[in-house]
Amino acid sequence: MRYIIAFIWTFLLSHMACYLVASMNSVTYNFKTSSVIAVVLYVLIMVLAEIMPMNKNASQH
């Protein structure tokens, strides 16, 4: 379930960012390019989440 929610948030936030950047640069918004960027970001986030060590003991801050 966390993978689905992470994909939805990554998809929405990357599309929002691409739309804002496109409008600030006075270029047209491209849904296909934004979707590719969203998928790449999702894969990077999931890989980093698996690589990073988890802190098993929360009392050691």
Curated annotation (Swiss-Prot):
GO terms for cellular component: plasma membrane. The keyword Transmembrane helix applies. It is found in: Cell membrane. It comes from the Bacteria. Pfam families: DUF2929 (PF11151). The chain crosses the membrane at residues 4-24, 34-54. InterPro entries: DUF2929. Keywords: Cell membrane, Membrane, Transmembrane, Transmembrane helix. It is a multi-pass membrane protein. This is Uncharacterized membrane protein YjzD. It comes from Bacillus subtilis (strain 168). The lineage of its organism: Bacteria, Bacillati, Bacillota, Bacilli, Bacillales.
